[in-house]
Amino acid sequence: MHVYSVTPESASRQREFTQDYLTRLRETGAACERAGWSGILVPHNLHEVDPWLIAGQLGAATDTLVPLVAVQPSSLPPHTAAAMAAAYATLYGRPLHFNLVAGARDDELRRTGDRLGHDERYERMREYGLVLRALLRGEEVDTEGRFYSYRGFRLEPRPEVLSQCKLFVAGSSPASIGVARDVADVVVTHPARYPEWEETFLKPLLAGGYTGELGIRIGIVARSAGEDAWVTARERFPETWQGRQETLLKTVSQSAWSRQLAVDAVAEAAAAAAAAASAESGESAGAAGEKEPDVYWLGAFRSGHASAPFLVGSHQDVGSRLAEYLRAGVGHVLLNGSYEYDHEDIGRALLAARRAAGS
């Protein structure tokens, strides 16, 4: 199992930072290496620091960590992305991976003038991925596409380590599954609860001919006692009026995974409210108050401060739930919103997952 942390936020509405961003970034990278994790996700958002500058700092501050750099095709052409990977490999003697994203925030797409529809953005991503993969392999690119055209272009210089770069494709829609089949080394999704994820994502993916690796983006809050994990999770991701409104807006997002998570998050909140009302009225004879919360939790997404579901509970409970995905073939776990002092507890949950999955 390959585990990836995520770069720290440069700014937050929730937290006041006592250290400058560069210090926090370097400490996060060092903590990931100590934990034995494979890499660190570097997101692409208009409100975050440029991902390529971040990747360079991580290369300078770590020895083995591999940045997983999010790339939105509208932000730079594939030959530039390949050249950036070549520069990174020349400086630090190791590859980096690419997380190809179509864009999940409708507001950012509008602000940058990206007017392509959902499926068109994935058509562009397919062309992008095919060109990028060819350049990383050292092939000459000669193509006339709808979005990209090249005449006898080859990446030079090209460090041999670029052959180890992987393309991750994020998404869960039929359009993204088609692109994953054609260009992805690893397909990544923000998973639903395991039975639904298997039925609505994994089976269609495999039926469509995908033969690559699997990844999931998920957060973890784990403690020795499940009750302590829930206290931490609810303090860290408090529900607010603004968060609920943002979640409602996401129910009509163009992004399939964001839209589905939002719909599920609203349903989860409604079910919890109904259970609380039932307990107050005495209809459940106290049973509702004694029921353990589900390990799979969308409250962090609903708060507006996380983009993925979370697994919350004891190390064993979180490990058991994560193991369901591992047994299905997931080999890459991209963590969402892990705090620097969470690494030890996350490591224990990951170890429990490996044991439960028999890996």
Whereabouts are the PLM-identified features?
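Acidic (Asp/Glu)-rich catalytic clusters
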Residues: 30-34, 55-64, 85-96, 181-182, ...
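Active-site mouth loops of central-metabolism enzymes
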Residues: 3-23, 70-74, 161-172, 223, ...
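N-terminal beta1-alpha1-beta2 module of alpha/beta enzyme domains
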Residues: 1-66, 164-165
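Active-site-adjacent beta->alpha loops and helix N-cap segments on the catalytic face
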Residues: 48-55, 193-207, 343-344
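An alpha-helical appendage that flanks or caps ligand/catalytic pockets
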Residues: 112, 118-159, 197-324
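Catalytic domains of carbohydrate-active enzymes, especially glycoside hydrolases
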Residues: 24-43, 179-187, 324-331
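Alpha-helix-loop-beta-strand connector modules within alpha/beta enzyme cores
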Residues: 51-72, 124-128, 210, 347-359
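Hydrophobic faces of well-ordered beta-strands that scaffold small-molecule active sites
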Residues: 1-8, 40-42, 65-71, 96-100, ...
